[in-house]
From Swiss-Prot:
GO cellular component, one term: microtubule
Swiss-Prot/TrEMBL site (Cleavage) positions: 117-118
Matches recorded under PANTHER family: MICROTUBULE-ASSOCIATED PROTEINS 1A/1B LIGHT CHAIN 3-RELATED
Subcellular location: Cytoplasmic vesicle, Autophagosome membrane; Vacuole membrane; Cytoplasm, Cytoskeleton
UniProt cross-references to InterPro entries, sorted A to Z: Atg8-like, Ubiquitin-like_domsf
Annotated source species: Arabidopsis thaliana
Protein name: Autophagy-related protein 8a
GO biological process: autophagy; protein transport
Renumbered residue ranges of the record's region Disordered: 1-21
Expressed in which tissues: Constitutively expressed.
Lineage: Eukaryota, Viridiplantae, Streptophyta, Embryophyta, Tracheophyta
Subunit structure and binding partners: Interacts with ATG4B. Interacts with NBR1.
Length: 122
């Protein structure tokens, strides 16, 4: 997995300090970094850092991402966490607890095509 540009431009200590400050100030919010997959043909997102309500579902967050990149309804978008498609109905808080980075942020990547993951169906 390619290193996040947010990770490259911000040292670990600074990211850890920022995420813990955010979690203290907003305990009901999840600090999320969203970046476009390298080879994706969808537009770039206007901002990378989001404070997401803990009770938001992945599907609702994907809707937010779609709106931020102004993607038409006819185009597909896939959001990945550690190269895996998270379940649409999963709460962002559950995804955060399972996949948060050592710096305290949850990193998500979006793409116009299913470039990474496999969808696991129970």
């Amino acid at each position: 997995m390619a290193k996040s540009s947010f990770k490259i431009s911000n040292p670990l200590e600074a990211r850890m300090s920022e995420s813990s400050r955010i979690r203290e100030k907003y305990p009901d919010r999840i600090p999320v970094i969203v970046e476009k997959a390298g080879q994706s043909d969808v537009p770039d997102i206007d901002k990378k850092k989001y404070l997401v309500p803990a009770d938001l579902t992945v599907g609702q967050f994907v809707y937010v991402v779609r709106k931020r990149i102004k993607l038409g309804a006819e185009k597909a978008i896939f959001v990945f966490v550690k190269n895996t498609l998270p379940p649409t109905a999963a709460l962002m808080s559950a995804i955060y607890e399972e996949h948060k980075d050592e710096d305290g942020f949850l990193y998500m990547t979006y793409s116009g095509e299913n470039t990474f993951g496999s969808l696991t169906v129970a």
